[in-house]
Amino acid sequence: MANVVVIGAQWGDEGKGKITDLLSRSADVVVRYQGGVNAGHTIVVDDKVLKLHLIPSGILYKNTSCLIGSGTVVDPKILLKEIDMLIDNGIDISGLKISSTSHVTMPYHRILDEAMEADRGSNKIGTTGRGIGPTYADKSQRNGIRIRDLLNKERLSDVIEIPLREKNGLLEKIYGIKPLKLEDIVEEYLDYGERLSKHVVDCTRTIHAASKNKKNILFEGAQGTLLDLDHGTYPFVTSSNPISGGACIGAGVGPTLIDRVIGVAKAYTTRVGEGPFPTELQGSINDQLCDRGSEFGTTTGRRRRCGWFDGVIGKYAVSVNGLDCLAVTKLDVLDELDEIQVCIAYDLDGEKIDYFPTNSDELKKCKPIFKKLKGWQCSTADCRKLSDLPENAMNYLRFLAELMEVPIAIVSLGANRDQTIVIEDPIHGPKRALLR
């Protein structure tokens, strides 16, 4: 038995959905522990493209229980759309469970999120506009609505009255937006609660029962390390903690329950929205990476910014998360390049540094110091074992492993499930990996 946390080692969009889907075959329980519909992952199954925002990837396996944990914020309207989409595709969702204490994204959260972002003008953070920040803000201010509140009309009417009055005041007086009606919201969200009620459980009890019965538990993070509220490129971050420590809080487990942590990183780097990005590329190579990598956000459809692999943020992710091994995705996107660069350090005001500045103002001034490596200029899409890879592709992977001081356990070479080289199964394999 092994309990594994899967995290993003960059700015999100690393391909965690595919890796989680792959590992879910060996997992009994998959737990989403933070974030909301601002995250998205795409899974390709039998030529079907499935895009999920809240439901864990493990839902595709009928013997796997999928739990949306207490640290996640839930937009029930979108969740129900995902459920309907899965049912329409013939997927059994009986294993889906939702924590009764997950907080709910309400309509005023979405409206406020968009209004606040528009009001920032040139100082935009790059929010998805899905209401995630305001939902977490209400949670912190002890003014939030939880899933359990949607199951009782009297309770919902009572708990929504004060936050709605406050939000209507903001909407009307500051942003000039028409106030929302309590009765309409209560009616709509009671209906959502009724439809979701059969999936609602006590999150902590469910996970600990599985652990007691020696089940394999997979904890699925959303976004990435550099978007972490406390450890990312603040203020250009999300409103929760995607790092591995967030799994303990968001799922309600102690750190001793976690056996290993796997980080997912692209063979290059991308970022959506605003904020510093030291290795960002411009021109033809940026366009090539974007086009070959289909770098458009699952949630927003926004074009992602592309750059070379950044070993400085990679080492930071290893440290902050305590990574045991790495999954490198989208290696195939680099297939046509004759030369590939990797950032090994930064130049900050004339000083060479190999650490990650958590101050965004300092990070903006950092200039990448690159190591040049030879490309392989042939397709890797059909490679299924390490020995199939071109020599220069192997050299590239070895360099990344040495730079980050963590072994590589999985290499992804395309969107399909079978386009993967599993060097070691992080759940059933020994606690080591073969590619260093």
Curated annotation (Swiss-Prot):
The active site is at residues 13, 41. InterPro entries: Adenylosuccin_syn_GTP-bd, Adenylosuccin_syn_Lys_AS, Adenylosuccinate_synth_dom1, Adenylosuccinate_synth_dom2, Adenylosuccinate_synth_dom3, Adenylosuccinate_synthetase, P-loop_NTPase. Gene3D superfamilies: Adenylosuccinate Synthetase, subunit A, domain 1 (3.40.440.10), Adenylosuccinate Synthetase, subunit A, domain 2 (1.10.300.10), Adenylosuccinate Synthetase, subunit A, domain 3 (3.90.170.10). It catalyses: IMP + L-aspartate + GTP = N(6)-(1,2-dicarboxyethyl)-AMP + GDP + phosphate + 2 H(+). Transmembrane segments: none annotated. Its EC number is 6.3.4.4. Pathway: Purine metabolism; AMP biosynthesis via de novo pathway; AMP from IMP: step 1/2. Pfam families: Adenylsucc_synt. Its main location: cytoplasm. It comes from the Bacteria. Keywords: Cytoplasm, GTP-binding, Ligase, Magnesium, Metal-binding, Nucleotide-binding, Purine biosynthesis. One of its GO terms (biological process) is IMP metabolic process. Binds 1 Mg(2+) ion per subunit. GO terms for molecular function: adenylosuccinate synthase activity; GTP binding; magnesium ion binding. Its cofactor is Mg(2+). One of its GO terms (cellular component) is cytoplasm. Mg(2+) binds at residues 13, 40. IMP binds at residues 13-16, 38-41, 128, 142, 223, 238, 302. It is found in: Cytoplasm. GTP binds at residues 12-18, 40-42, 304, 330-332, 412-414. Belongs to the adenylosuccinate synthetase family. Plays an important role in the de novo pathway of purine nucleotide biosynthesis. Catalyzes the first committed step in the biosynthesis of AMP from IMP. This is Adenylosuccinate synthetase. It comes from Prochlorococcus marinus (strain MIT 9301).
